[in-house]
Amino acid sequence: MQDLSGSFVALVTPMFENGDIDYVSLKNLIDWHFHSGTDGIVSVGTTGESATINFNDHHDVLKETLNIINGRMIAVAGTGANSTEEAKDLSLEAERIGYKYSLSVTPYYNKPTQKGLIEHYEYITGKSEISQILYNVPSRTACDMEPSTVGKLSENPKIIGIKEA
């Protein structure tokens, strides 16, 4: 497994006023981060508008980001969603495109129990091979993953880390 240490940036998804993705700005932004010494990019995470763009745009931005990075930095796909099925589908799509790592925020709005969180992540990892990084951001999701839940999930070899915000 690749070393996931260093500076990782949760990249914004640049858009035009009409909501279309600005791929020229995406390339410029990624190139700037590469030349500035950034070690890894998280594409279409919560900072990248994952909750507001459609599945096709999500796919296209993930794919284009990986093409632009072209092995120069570590690429992490934002695959979190409120729906477990959608998070699974995004994880499978990221894996198909060529990502090795995904960042998956806890489901928001529905406020799952700790048991529900375990079931959510176990379901996703049971359906895909991509390595998952848990993302706990209770101030945004109204759901706080407890240390005991993280401990239980850490027993899963496909869950390789956590982003705590």
Residue ranges and their predicted role:
Residues 102, 157-165:
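Catalytic beta/alpha-barrel core
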